[in-house]
Design a protein with these regions (language model features):
Chain B
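Thiotemplate assembly-line natural product biosynthesis machinery
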Residues: 2-24, 77-80
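Two-component histidine kinase catalytic core, primarily the HATPase_c
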Residues: 42
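Core alpha-helical elements of the protein kinase catalytic domain
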Residues: 13, 48-49
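N-terminal helix-turn-helix DNA-binding core of bacterial DNA-binding proteins
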Residues: 25, 29-36
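Short coil/turn motifs that cap or connect alpha-helices
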Residues: 22, 57-59
């Protein structure tokens, strides 16, 4: 019998040195060129412009063309975010892409996006659907503070039109395309509050790709689309997520009255309205309603709304914004951030 | 425990709050969708508010079976029993 292995004990690790705080320094967005009004999609689903607006608040959406891919849209949004942050591209040390519509099982979109930006830094995708952007912000915050990266690009991007069944009355008018990006980096003061996040995989079937890739192959099915049980999602999103949003406010050490913006995932105007009601938000707080002209762009919806509202002067630079993402998984993430 | 007429009255108030439909319009034989023109998301809001008011649990799968006001009243009465 040999003795149990013992460590040499001669080397002491150097711990990574992180920044004391992190914040979002800039946001950018890319909206595909083609505007698709409700009138263009109503015939196939035997619906009307009025019906769609009543149920979702959506008037039009953007659908990407063949030349506008998950990668190209990401690159465009990322360049804008980097410019807004006032840093050089070569200062970016990590790229996180959140998407569910990158059409390759592997590799991830992030390394390709990084390459297109001239970067060779760490780059990986996360799959957290409509909550992906808030997951990315939380990861980036931890990476900056943990010392594993300086400036981090967080990109939420979707080309959901590739995964939408135009004849599905519950999703055809909801899903759309676009990309939003944020640069997270070191800060002297706290800029990203504690993230409240979690999952409920017991409800994984409420929003999902209708058939697995194996079913598509083995049963000779058509290209799969994403389906949704609208009522169940509505209940979970409104009555399940309002308390999560409240916990994010509490964890940040502020009150709802301190907020300068509420930026919920743009899932459905009815969800947004009901959530505002549940949260009892003061009426003067601007609420993202980008869904009207953008529809539901999943991971891209929050940064796209943020970019637009900042650009149009609806919300203040340096203000406090509550953002919450929730979606397929089911998964969710919420945090209060200082607006860039 | 609420009686059937109390459940109907409470339900009518919840429907009124969500949709603006007059409480007198919310009658037992009315269909939520066909007669009262209540869409699926409003129906879910009504369901959640009814759960809270009557202290019952109405599962998502059950909601599609609640076609008329009577269906809802009966389900709530049964769930309370």
């Amino acid at each position: 019998m040999s003795a149990a292995a013992a460590p040499k004990g001669t080397g002491t690790l150097t711990a990574p040195a992180g920044a004391r705080h992190a914040r979002i320094w800039g946001v950018g967005g890319y909206r595909p060129e083609r505007v698709v009004p409700n009138s263009e999609i109503v015939d196939v689903i035997d619906s009307s412009d009025e019906w769609i607006q009543e149920r979702s608040g959506i008037k039009s959406r953007r659908w990407a063309g063949p030349h506008e891919t998950v990668v190209t849209m990401s690159v465009a949004a990322a360049r804008e975010a980097v410019a807004a942050a006032g840093i050089r591209l070569d200062q970016v040390e990590a790229v996180i892409v959140s998407t569910v519509s990158h059409p390759y099982q592997t590799p991830a979109a992030a390394p390709i996006v990084a390459d297109a930006l001239g970067l060779r830094c760490v780059a990986f995708d996360i799959s957290a659907a409509c909550a992906g952007y808030c997951h990315g912000i939380s990861l980036a915050n931890d990476m900056v503070r943990g010392g594993s990266a300086g400036f981090v690009l967080v990109i939420g991007v979707e080309k959901l039109s590739d995964f939408t069944d135009p004849t599905d009355r519950s999703t055809a008018f909801i899903f759309a395309d676009g990309a939003g990006a944020a640069v997270v980096g070191p800060s002297d003061t706290p800029g990203i509050g504690p993230t409240i996040w979690g999952s409920d995989g017991a409800q994984w079937e409420t929003i999902k790709q209708n058939e697995s890739w194996l079913e598509v192959r083995d049963q000779g099915l058509d290209f799969p689309s994403i389906g949704m049980q609208g009522q169940s999602v509505f209940r979970w999103a409104v009555w399940g997520m309002a308390p999560v949003a409240q916990r994010a406010i509490d964890a940040a050490g502020i009150t709802a009255a301190d907020l300068d913006a509420f930026l919920p995932h743009q899932a459905n105007m009815r969800i947004i309205d009901a959530m505002v009601k549940q949260l009892k938000l003061p009426a003067d707080i601007p609420v993202a309603r980008d869904i009207v002209e953008t529809a539901n762009t999943s991971a891209a919806s929050i940064p796209l709304a943020t970019e637009r509202m900042l650009r149009e002067g609806e919300i203040p630079h340096g203000g406090l914004a509550l953002q919450i993402g929730f979606g397929a998984g089911l998964v969710y993430a919420a945090q209060v951030v200082v607006l860039p | 425990m609420a009686s059937e007429s109390e459940i109907l009255e409470g339900l009518a108030e919840i429907v009124n709050e969500e949709t603006g439909i007059d409480t007198a319009e919310v009658e037992l034989d009315k269909s939520f969708t066909d007669d009262l023109d209540i869409d699926s998301l409003s129906m879910m809001t009504i369901v959640v508010n009814a759960e809270e008011r009557f202290g019952v649990r109405i599962p998502d799968d059950e909601v599609k079976n609640l076609k008329t006001v009577r269906d809802a009243v009966n389900f709530i009465a049964g769930a309370q029993a």
